Amino acid sequence: MRPDLRRQVKPAYFFHPLPFVKRVVFIATPHSGSMLASLGVGRAASLTVQQPPEMKAIHDEIVRDNPGSFRPDYERSLPTTVDVLEPDSMILQSLRGLRVPCWVTTHSIIGNAHQSPLGDGGDCIVPVSSARLPGVVSEVLVPAKHTKVHHHPDTIAELERILVQHLRETGL
């Protein structure tokens, strides 16, 4: 791979913790994906996503210069954000394998607007089970759909609580 191309794509494939990030709040985050990505609506949405021409050119060059290194579906095109949200996505599975650094405090705010027949609630896009992350110091369920979780008064109150706590702990 050309050195300039390697430098360009490296940040997309190699993740390093940022030492100045001390706290993370996940809001309606599908850590384990969403079944909607695998259903008709997700497939239709994925088909409408167009790669920028420069990304397609980079992808084509990498595949051409590394024959047999990619799964057939990745040889054809890069996965879309919808593809990555499929629960069995290899990329999503790899991301789940990354660990949050020990110096980072994590919180989850999870939408829970409905109960499914299987007993797992969710925000109509992300099931609660997908939004849960082991090791968070706080988890709040908000009675809101996915597109409204971020604006819900319970979310705003929880964010304010977390920010005040962070200020107290850091002495800022």
Language model features with spans:
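Helical cap/lid subdomain of alpha/beta-hydrolase-fold lipid enzymes
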Residues: 1-172
